[in-house]
């Protein structure tokens, strides 16, 4: 089972940023996950409905928290069924209840900061910088 402490959360998020690029801006109203169908993938919209044609995993957008959790070993199919239901704290608690991971409380605050900025339309690199500043300042905006 994956345990996410703050160092692990930062590593996984930074891997996501490296993959997409620090200037990547998440298309908030776009499809968020892909579901495996043999070796192909289909977009899945925020409400969980399949959309569009099959695409490769490289083409399938996902939020920064979802990408990080996937990189940590949370199954894509589980993310598909659950991640659109809420924000970072909701997803972490749901995954913990499902037995997929455990996490430290400071992870919730840091990932929430990352997600807030991502959802406000800033780049993933800027979202991580914001979360790091919030952590340094004791999370005054959370």
Model region roles, listed by residue range:
Residues 10, 14-17, 132:
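Residue-level detector of alpha-helical secondary structure
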């Amino acid at each position: 089972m994956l345990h996410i402490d703050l160092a692990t959360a930062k590593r996984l998020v930074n891997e996501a940023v490296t993959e997409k690029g620090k200037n990547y801006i998440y298309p908030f109203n776009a499809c968020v996950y892909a579901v495996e169908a043999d070796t192909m993938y289909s977009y899945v919209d925020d409400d969980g409905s399949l959309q569009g044609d099959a695409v490769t995993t490289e083409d399938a957008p996902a939020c920064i928290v979802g990408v990080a959790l996937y990189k940590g070993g949370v199954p894509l199919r589980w993310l598909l069924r659950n991640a659109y239901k809420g924000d970072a704290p909701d997803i972490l608690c749901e995954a913990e209840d499902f037995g997929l991971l455990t996490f430290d409380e400071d992870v919730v605050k840091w990932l929430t900061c990352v997600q807030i900025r991502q959802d406000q339309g800033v780049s993933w690199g800027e979202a991580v910088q914001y979360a790091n500043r919030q952590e340094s300042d004791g999370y005054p905006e959370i």
